[in-house]
């Protein structure tokens, strides 16, 4: 159905299902306030929910079915991440698109009740849309990657539903998906799938929910900056700062002195400086024209990377961010940040989630309605229209 009848979060004209999936995906990632997982290095909920909230307006989907769809998509994203290894992301692929599109196809296939053969075709079709390079980070196209993943994931499921076929053995064959997108550290997808493990990905490898609207690699230095803010009373007495962090992260958080808010999200130096100076970090912190002190502070910050082994996993607490501050009087302060707020050790509270909703433009009266009512047996469409 290509009629323009899908309402869009954030306002604007109604769009077709394809255009709605794309725009929802772009908006979900545009301020980097999404979730992420460390196995594939993707942002699982952004493309999956962007697809589901679009489809739910033309097909009845219960909240329970929404959960199931998300879990199936997440499961496949994790399995693919395990098979490809961290090298997929390290080489330069943006897995939110390369793997996210496949997870989205699986999630949509689940809620559309495709049979096993159709779903196998859908996720294979989705590999033809696997694209997106990390070298685009710091520009608008990074958010577009999530839009592409959402849009193409739905297209893949619909093509399969209507008889479209693809090579169901594409994963492990010679010159197949794993070989081309992986490395010498990759392993066959089938080796990672045991029936006893199915459905447990979210338990074994839970997603992280961002506390601040920046790249996930910038989260730990913000924590460190907020701690240092309470310890350093006269910021102008800072002589120099060094940030030591895992070498792979520099391929992402590479902007020392950002030129705009998009680059600022991928700037360890700017995020640290802003948190240290202001004692807080929110969406306004990314308006660099109003944070001149932060920009000036970045010039005092030196970025130093350290090597990690081939077995490195993202956000492993064994490989922390280390912030070293030298004051004008020669005194030294060191903060070592190993865990991320929003992760396993410091999960977000309901009030933190509520604040994210409000920061993104949500209304408090709507939030109260959602919090005070039980929606488990209701349709996703009802909540969409409420918001």
Enumerate the language-model features and the residues they cover.
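Short helix-coil transition sites and intra-membrane helix breaks within transmembrane domains
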Residues: 39-45, 93-98, 211
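Short connector loops/turns at beta-strand edges and beta->alpha or beta->beta junctions
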Residues: 28, 47-49, 54, 76, ...
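Short acidic alpha-helix initiation/capping motifs at coil-to-helix transition points
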Residues: 45-46, 97-102, 349-353
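Glycine-rich, mobile lid/loop segments that gate access to catalytic sites or pores
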Residues: 57-155, 162, 167-174
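Contiguous domain-boundary segments centered on the initiation and propagation of an alpha-helix
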Residues: 42-46, 61-64, 71, 288-292, ...
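Terminal-appendage/accessory-domain detector
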Residues: 1-41, 138-152, 158-387
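Alpha-helical support elements that line or immediately flank enzyme active sites
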Residues: 44-65, 102-114, 215-233, 276, ...
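Function-dense linear segments that define catalytic or interfacial modules
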Residues: 22-62, 76
């Amino acid at each position: 159905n290509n009629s323009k009848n899908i309402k869009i979060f954030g306002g604007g004209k109604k769009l077709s299902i394809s255009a709605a999936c794309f725009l929802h995906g772009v908006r979900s990632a545009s301020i980097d306030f999404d979730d992420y997982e460390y196995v594939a290095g993707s942002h699982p909920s952004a493309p999956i929910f962007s697809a589901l909230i679009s489809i739910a307006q033309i097909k009845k989907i219960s909240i329970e079915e929404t959960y199931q769809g998300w879990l199936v998509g997440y499961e496949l994203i994790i399995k693919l991440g395990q098979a490809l290894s961290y090298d997929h992301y390290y080489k330069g692929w943006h897995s939110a698109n390369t793997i996210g599109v496949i997870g989205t196809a699986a999630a949509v296939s689940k809620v559309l009740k495709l049979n096993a053969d159709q779903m196998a075709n859908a996720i294979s079709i989705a590999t033809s849309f696997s694209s997106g390079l990390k070298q685009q980070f710091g520009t608008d196209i990074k958010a577009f990657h999530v839009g592409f993943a959402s849009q193409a994931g739905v297209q893949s499921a619909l093509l399969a539903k209507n008889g479209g076929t693809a090579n169901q053995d594409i994963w492990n064959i010679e010159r197949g998906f794993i070989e081309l997108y992986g490395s010498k550290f990759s392993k066959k997808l089938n080796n990672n799938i045991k029936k006893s493990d199915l459905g447990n990905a979210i338990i074994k490898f839970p997603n992280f929910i961002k506390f601040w609207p920046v790249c996930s690699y910038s989260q730990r230095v913000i924590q460190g900056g907020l701690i240092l803010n309470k310890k350093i009373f006269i910021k102008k007495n800072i002589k120099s700062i060094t940030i030591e962090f895992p070498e792979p992260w520099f391929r992402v958080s590479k902007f020392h002195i950002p030129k705009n808010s998009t680059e600022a999200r991928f700037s360890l130096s700017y995020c640290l400086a802003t948190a240290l100076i202001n004692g807080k970090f929110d969406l306004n912190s990314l308006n660099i024209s109003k944070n001149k002190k932060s920009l000036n502070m970045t010039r005092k910050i030196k970025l130093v990377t350290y090597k990690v082994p081939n077995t490195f996993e993202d956000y492993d607490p064994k490989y922390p961010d280390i912030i070293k501050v030298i004051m004008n009087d020669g005194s030294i302060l060191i903060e070592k940040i190993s865990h991320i707020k929003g992760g396993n050790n410091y999960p977000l509270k309901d009030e933190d989630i509520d604040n994210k909703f409000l920061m993104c433009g949500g209304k408090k009266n709507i939030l109260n309605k959602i919090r005070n009512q039980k929606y488990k047996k209701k349709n996703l469409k009802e909540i969409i229209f409420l918001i």
